[in-house]
């Protein structure tokens, strides 16, 4: 099925529109890109195979960020038994919009067929002050398909004294198993609002992350135990670096919550440093992959360059 959101993204009189269509197929135990069509400044490098037949694909946006009116539309089809990992070579950026407050949008639509596994593991996105960011993810799964994906979003760059004082970020996730919704979620963050500091909101956290997985081989209890091990390591690193967690600095170590939904697990993280949230998510990804395949995951080498 095709997931359609309630309203299409508004057409912009300015900005660049770019699209990318990918089709991944399994051939003789190896996943290949059998379809690769792009329009505008959005494309992929050649596939990489650091772990046997799993296809690693880096999605490139040469301009390096979204400005007023830019629109990215990415569509991915994973045919039966394909194993596809999608990532990005560097942090994404959504810069301040113009006086017309034109949206800067990215829509990613993924279809995963029976027996296939798709992983969407991008590097973090930085939403700058005055941005009007829209980020939409729609995933359609066949019975017997697997999906793991995450998003890590930095609201401003406080370490550089660049705060998210105005603008907005509108995030929408829709994950379906055939015609049945597993997750429908809308989040909106408004720059400079009480939501960013209030206890009922982000409570001062400037980096937020969400990981979702259909992995049934790992229980929520195992995930929570793994998270505690990762957080213990982060606490030790923070202490060694002199970053003690205090009441005025509650997110020197991230806050993590796990929700076990029917056929889907959702992990949410609040923090102050993207690198810490990436440590949580990559650690969990390795555990999930080992449980699913019985083999250790090999991280994309672009993450270390």
Residue ranges and their predicted role:
Residues 22, 74-76, 110, 139, ...:
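Preference for bulky hydrophobic residues occupying beta-strand positions
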Residues 83-85, 117-119, 146-148, 209-210, ...:
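Structural motif
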Residues 2-3, 9, 17-19, 23-39, ...:
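N-terminal intrinsically disordered, cationic/polar leader segments
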Residues 1-124, 129, 136, 286:
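N-terminal, charged/glycine-rich beta-strand/loop interface patches
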Residues 78-80, 88-90, 112-114, 122-124, ...:
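Short, structured patches in soluble enzyme cores that scaffold and shape functional sites
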Residues 96, 153-305:
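A structural signal for small-residue-enriched, beta-sheet-centric alpha/beta enzyme cores
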Residues 22, 50, 54, 115, ...:
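A generic structural signal for ordered alpha-helices
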């Amino acid at each position: 099925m095709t997931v359609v959101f309630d309203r299409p993204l508004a057409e912009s009189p300015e900005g660049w529109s770019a699209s990318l269509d990918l089709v991944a197929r399994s051939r003789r135990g190896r996943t290949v890109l059998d379809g690769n069509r792009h329009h505008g400044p959005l494309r992929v490098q050649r596939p990489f195979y650091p772990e046997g037949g799993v296809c690693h694909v880096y999605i490139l946006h040469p301009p390096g960020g979204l400005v007023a009116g830019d629109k990215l539309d990415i569509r991915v089809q994973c045919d039966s038994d394909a194993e596809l990992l999608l990532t990005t070579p560097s942090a994404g950026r959504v810069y301040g919009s113009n006086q017309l407050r034109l949206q800067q949008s990215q829509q990613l639509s993924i279809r995963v067929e029976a027996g296939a596994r798709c992983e969407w593991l991008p590097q973090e996105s930085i939403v700058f002050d005055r941005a009007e960011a829209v980020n939409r993810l729609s995933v359609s799964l066949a019975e017997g398909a697997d999906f793991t994906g995450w998003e890590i979003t930095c609201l401003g760059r406080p370490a550089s004294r660049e705060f998210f004082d105005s603008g907005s970020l509108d995030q929408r996730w829709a994950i379906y198993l055939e015609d049945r919704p597993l997750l429908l979620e809308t989040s909106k963050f408004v720059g400079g609002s009480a939501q960013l500091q209030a206890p009922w909101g982000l409570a001062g956290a400037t980096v937020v992350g969400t990981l979702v997985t259909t992995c049934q081989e790992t229980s929520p209890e195992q995930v929570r135990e793994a998270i505690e091990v990762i957080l213990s390591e982060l606490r030790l690193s923070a202490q060694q670096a002199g970053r003690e967690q205090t009441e005025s600095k509650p997110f020197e170590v991230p806050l993590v919550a796990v929700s076990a939904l029917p056929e889907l697990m959702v992990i949410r993280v609040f923090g102050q440093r993207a690198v810490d949230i990436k440590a949580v998510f990559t650690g969990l990804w390795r555990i999930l992959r080992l449980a699913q395949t019985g083999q250790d995951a090999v991280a994309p080498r672009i993450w270390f360059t």
